[in-house]
């Protein structure tokens, strides 16, 4: 068969036109070494800091991802998120072009998830409609609003003396076994019916401890508005490091839509240790206490994201869907100290970043004063502006009584005979100290807390035996609930005494009536 040149060129042209040339340009590299969850990769020329890298799937077909942290001249250092036993030298690694993301939204509420937002509670998949990046820039000064709304923790000593406002960062610091987690869990339980979504991030905790926390939240009915992000001690250092940022992103979803959220980081000491481990394995130069140079930035960029944002920010973010509402993310980071040393590297860093701190002391805890809060050195730098009028008006005397009591108690040890005024102050201080004790998982509503503070401030407890103070308080609460429910409802609603003085008169009358019946 004879073909002329014109036919040949037509044939080639038609073949070229009919060719389905689908090309997939991907930036990929090769694994050079794998050690302790750290992978060195050669050939990833267009990778971003913090980008998700796709590794070969696990034996059961689950996708495997890593996080690019070290960008060097001829190689990339990455941490594997999850299992790494199946990865070997020579494996292909692909760029995804995406920064690490986690699912966000109301679908996560009531669930227990890992650091990547994957469910680990056995209640089925989470069908979240949205995802968001874990690393974000915190809202600027213009987008913020001053903290002036209270976040009630239900704990007498905190709400009276170191109040927390919505959008504040209040550090809980103390040695191990001083009740730090208990304070945070009580604060979460106290948000029931307050319209606050809570996120509890467990970093480096024992799996059994996390299970106990979840059980306590379920029994109190608090899981209905809580997300638990768990990175237990058995998980990799990378997962423990990432978990705090994942939880923060989940909280920001609510903040940016004009809602209120509370996040607890339990605890940031273990997150810093996990980050130190990752940094040392990546051969980054160590600094003080072998922590890397950016350990301050590790916590500052996390805690600065807790803020109260103004209505303009919320309106711009939601594209006009939500108007006239401010949003807030309140943070309660926890730091564990060694033998009460608050001047160590990580504690001083976090103290300088936060808006105040609640100090818990072993000596107080062992003396039976629980929560073991040292009111003398605990402060709230911005919460005073957010404190409810009811508690603010009554709490000034409490702090003064305690301060004078501590001063006189030390002096009274050496004095044999004390004058009447000193004895009165010592007696009042002993009763206030006793009154600030509170059982775990029993946060108080604002009305009952106000009644308690009113009773001690007006001297109704001065002649009650110290050992019977707590019995007097619980009896008074029960009496008010049964006989003066309307008064409690008014105090709960108005969060202040009325200007005419009727509420104060009724409360005085009620306490006097109860005291006559109290044996």
Swiss-Prot record:
Annotated InterPro entries: ATP_synth_asu-like_sf, ATP_synth_asu_C, ATP_synth_asu_C_sf, ATP_synth_F1_a_nt-bd_dom, ATP_synth_F1_asu, ATPase_a/bsu_AS, ATPase_F1/V1/A1_a/bsu_N, ATPase_F1/V1/A1_a/bsu_N_sf
Annotated compartments: Cell inner membrane
Enzyme class: translocase
PANTHER family: ATP SYNTHASE SUBUNIT ALPHA, MITOCHONDRIAL (PTHR48082:SF2)
Protein family according to the UniProt entry: Belongs to the ATPase alpha/beta chains family.
Chief localisation class: membrane
Keyword Translocase in annotation: yes
Function summary: Produces ATP from ADP in the presence of a proton gradient across the membrane. The alpha chain is a regulatory subunit.
Subunit structure: F-type ATPases have 2 components, CF(1) - the catalytic core - and CF(0) - the membrane proton channel. CF(1) has five subunits: alpha(3), beta(3), gamma(1), delta(1), epsilon(1). CF(0) has three main subunits: a(1), b(2) and c(9-12). The alpha and beta chains form an alternating ring which encloses part of the gamma chain. CF(1) is attached to CF(0) by a central stalk formed by the gamma and epsilon chains, while a peripheral stalk is formed by the delta and b chains.
Catalytic activity: ATP + H2O + 4 H(+)(in) = ADP + phosphate + 5 H(+)(out)
Pfam families: ATP-synt_ab, ATP-synt_ab_C, ATP-synt_ab_N
Membrane disposition: Peripheral membrane protein
EC assignment: 7.1.2.2
Superkingdom classification of source: Bacteria
Molecular function terms from GO: ADP binding; ATP binding; proton-transporting ATP synthase activity, rotational mechanism
Keywords annotated in UniProt: ATP synthesis, ATP-binding, Cell inner membrane, Cell membrane, CF(1), Hydrogen ion transport, Ion transport, Membrane, Nucleotide-binding, Translocase, Transport
GO CC entries: plasma membrane; proton-transporting ATP synthase complex
Transmembrane intervals: none
NCBIfam families in the cross-refs: atpA, PRK13343.1
Positions of the record's site feature: Required for activity: 378
Name of the molecule in the record: ATP synthase subunit alpha
Protein residues bound to ATP: 174-181
């Amino acid at each position: 068969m004879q073909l002329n040149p014109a036919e040949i060129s037509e044939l080639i042209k038609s073949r070229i036109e009919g060719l389905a040339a689908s090309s997939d340009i991907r930036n990929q590299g090769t694994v050079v070494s794998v050690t302790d969850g750290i992978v060195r990769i050669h050939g990833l020329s267009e990778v971003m800091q913090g980008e998700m890298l796709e590794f070969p799937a696990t034996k059961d077909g689950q996708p495997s991802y890593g996080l690019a942290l070290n960008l060097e001249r001829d190689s990339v250092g990455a941490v594997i998120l999850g299992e790494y036993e199946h990865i070997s030298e020579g494996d292909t690694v692909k760029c995804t072009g995406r920064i690490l993301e986690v699912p966000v939204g109301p679908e996560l509420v009531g669930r227990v998830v890992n650091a990547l937002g994957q469910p680990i509670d056995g209640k089925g998949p989470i069908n979240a409609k949205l995802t968001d990046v874990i690393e974000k820039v915190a809202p600027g000064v213009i987008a913020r609003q001053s903290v002036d709304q209270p976040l009630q923790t239900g704990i007498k000593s905190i709400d009276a003396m170191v109040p927390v406002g919505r959008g504040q960062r209040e550090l809980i610091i103390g040695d191990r076994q001083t009740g730090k987690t208990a304070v945070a869990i009580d604060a979460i339980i106290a948000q029931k019916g307050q319209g606050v979504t809570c996120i509890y991030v467990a970093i480096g905790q024992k799996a059994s401890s996390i299970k106990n926390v979840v059980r306590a939240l379920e029994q109190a009915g608090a899981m209905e508005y809580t997300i638990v992000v768990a990175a237990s001690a058995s998980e990799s250092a990378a997962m423990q490091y990432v978990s705090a940022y994942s939880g923060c992103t989940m909280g920001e979803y609510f903040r940016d839509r004009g809602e209120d959220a509370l996040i607890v980081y339990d605890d940031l000491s273990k997150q810093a240790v996990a980050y130190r481990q990752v940094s040392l394995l990546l051969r980054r130069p160590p600094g003080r206490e072998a922590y890397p140079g950016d350990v301050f930035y590790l916590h500052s960029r996390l805690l600065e994201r807790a803020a109260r944002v103004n209505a303009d920010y919320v309106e711009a973010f939601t594209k006009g869907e939500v108007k006239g509402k401010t949003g807030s993310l309140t943070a309660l980071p926890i730091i564990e100290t060694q033998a009460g040393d608050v001047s160590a590297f990580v504690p001083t860093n976090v103290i300088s970043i936060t808006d105040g701190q609640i100090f818990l002391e072993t000596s107080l805890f062992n003396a039976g004063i629980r929560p073991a809060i040292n009111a003398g050195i605990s402060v709230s730098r911005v919460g005073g502006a957010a404190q409810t009028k009811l508690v603010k008006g009554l709490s000034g005397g409490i702090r003064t009584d305690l301060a004078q009591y501590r001063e006189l108690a030390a002096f009274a040890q050496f004095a044999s005979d004390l004058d009447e005024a000193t004895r009165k102050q010592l007696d009042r201080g002993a009763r206030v100290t006793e009154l600030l004790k509170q059982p775990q998982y029993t946060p108080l509503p604002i009305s009952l807390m106000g009644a308690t503070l009113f009773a001690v401030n007006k001297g109704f407890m001065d002649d009650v035996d110290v050992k019977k103070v707590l019995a007097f308080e619980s009896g008074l609460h029960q009496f008010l609930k049964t006989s003066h429910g309307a008064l409690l409802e008014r105090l709960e609603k108005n969060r202040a005494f009325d200007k005419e003085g009727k509420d104060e008169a009724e409360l005085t009358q009620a306490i006097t009536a109860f005291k006559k019946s109290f044996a």
